[in-house]
C-alpha cells in the first residue's frame, strides 16, 4: 500500500505533513509513504505512482500566498484522481477551492482565541457527524483537535456536509459520487483521552 502525502506547506514551514506521516507509520506497519510538495503534483505523476490513497496536508500560509499555477496540478488531481483522497484542515479547504467554492475567515467566534486579527478554533472540541464514510462505527458526536481560523464557506456542487459544530458548519464533507473527503480538524492529533481521530484515519485507509 502506497500513500501519496501531498505537502501543502511553503518551504516546509508547518508541522502537518510530518505529523501525518508519523501517525500513518504508527497505525499501519510496513506502509509506504511518499511525501511530495504541492507544486510538484500532477495527474500524470499520480498515474505513474499508482498510490492506493492520497492525503492532502494542512497549509502553512494564507491561500492568497499560493499562486494559481503552483496549485493547478494538485487541483486537477483532486478533481480527477480515482483514488480515495482525504484533505486535512488546509487540505479540506483546498478541495473546496479546487471546485470553486469559497474559503474565508470563520464568522462564529466561540470557542476560539485571538489570532492574527481573527478568531482561531484551537484545541479539542466536539463535532457532530453523520456516521457515514470515514465516520463509520464512530459515535454521532466525536472529539477531535482543531487549529484553524478559515473555513469552507459553502459546499462545492456535488458535495454534502458530513460533520459540523457551532463554530464551523462544514467540519467535514464528502463528494457524492467519489471517495473524496475533507475534514477541517486534525484527526492525526489524537491521544488516549481523545482517540476518535485515529478511527477516522483507519476508516480512510480501509477504503
Predicted regions and their residues:
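Glycine-rich, phosphate-binding/catalytic loops in enzymes
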Residues: 20-23, 70-75, 103-105, 162-163, ...
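Short, charged N-terminal beta->alpha structural module
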Residues: 3-28
Amino acid at each position: 500500500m502506497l500513500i501519496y502525502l501531498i505537502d501543502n506547506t511553503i518551504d516546509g514551514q508547518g508541522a502537518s505533513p510530518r505529523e501525518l506521516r508519523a501517525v500513518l507509520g504508527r497505525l499501519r506497519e510496513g506502509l509506504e509513504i511518499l511525501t511530495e510538495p504541492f507544486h510538484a503534483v500532477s495527474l500524470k505523476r499520480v498515474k505513474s505512482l499508482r498510490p492506493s490513497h492520497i492525503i492532502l496536508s494542512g497549509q502553512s500560509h494564507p491561500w492568497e500566498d499560493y499562486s494559481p499555477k503552483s496549485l493547478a496540478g494538485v487541483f486537477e488531481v483532486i478533481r480527477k484522481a480515482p483514488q480515495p483522497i482525504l484533505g486535512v484542515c488546509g487540505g479540506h479547504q483546498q478541495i473546496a477551492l479546487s471546485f470553486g467554492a469559497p474559503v474565508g475567515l470563520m464568522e462564529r467566534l466561540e470557542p476560539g482565541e485571538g489570532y492574527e486579527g481573527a478568531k482561531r478554533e484551537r484545541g479539542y472540541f466536539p463535532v457532530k457527524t453523520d456516521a457515514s464514510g470515514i465516520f463509520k462505527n464512530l459515535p454521532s458526536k466525536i472529539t477531535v483537535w482543531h487549529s484553524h481560523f478559515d473555513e469552507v464557506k459553502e459546499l462545492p456542487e456535488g458535495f454534502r456536509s458530513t460533520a459540523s459544530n457551532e463554530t464551523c458548519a462544514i467540519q467535514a464533507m464528502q463528494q457524492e459520487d467519489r471517495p473524496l473527503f475533507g475534514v477541517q480538524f486534525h484527526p492525526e492529533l489524537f491521544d488516549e483521552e481523545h482517540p476518535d481521530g485515529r478511527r477516522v484515519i483507519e476508516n480512510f485507509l480501509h477504503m
